[in-house]
């Protein structure tokens, strides 16, 4: 997977429709794919935000290509208003979100996000390690009930209790589950691979743990609320999500904002084409929604 290949890029740009002289926030900068697309589309400014310090390396490349037009602030997007103060702006013409884990995070085994390569049980998006909980906290400390609930609710894993019992049994016999390979092996031992669904049996549980570690759903709620407060009239909020729970939060928030002077840009979520899915499997579950402030 390529960290420079953002999902639904053209569709996002179509909804955002960047204008010369405008100011946009890329709330999930990552590898800079969305920011690059916006900067190439119009002579505008992008305020880039990301909680992962690694993103600053991609920012340097973009900054040299678009001097004075892109600026970076290390922050969670739930702190959008604080970030805007740092940039000395009160409002913007649009905010874009590409939520969830990035390809560059997945591809680095030292981050612990992937079950494909051995790595530490980490999964913290904030590499400064200001978060107190990690994947190790989850597998080695949570109660059976809490663990099963997280795996079922955040991962949609029907066999959540079976997975939980296997994790609890392993940690009781071995004292600790040491790395992502250990964890993936435990999950695969109790979740059969489906012929109808090609995804790895560990996918849903790893996803659930990542969402729990980073408090992703509450972050998204806070980020959307902050975005609604910083866009001016005509300003847009565009969100690409990858999980049904994320999309539900976006849909619910956008519907609520219709009572506050916002209007949906697209009534139904935009999904990737078969061509994009074949070229970038990460896009398979993506959904894109947009809303504009009309008054």
From Swiss-Prot:
HAMAP family: 16SrRNA_methyltr_H. Residues 275-295 are annotated as: Disordered. It is an enzyme of class 2 (transferase). This is Ribosomal RNA small subunit methyltransferase H. Specifically methylates the N4 position of cytidine in position 1402 (C1402) of 16S rRNA. S-adenosyl-L-methionine binds at residues 32-34, 50, 77, 98, 105. Its EC number is 2.1.1.199. Disulfide bonds: none annotated. The gene is rsmH. Its main location: cytoplasm. Keywords: Cytoplasm, Methyltransferase, rRNA processing, S-adenosyl-L-methionine, Transferase. GO terms for molecular function: rRNA (cytosine-N4-)-methyltransferase activity.
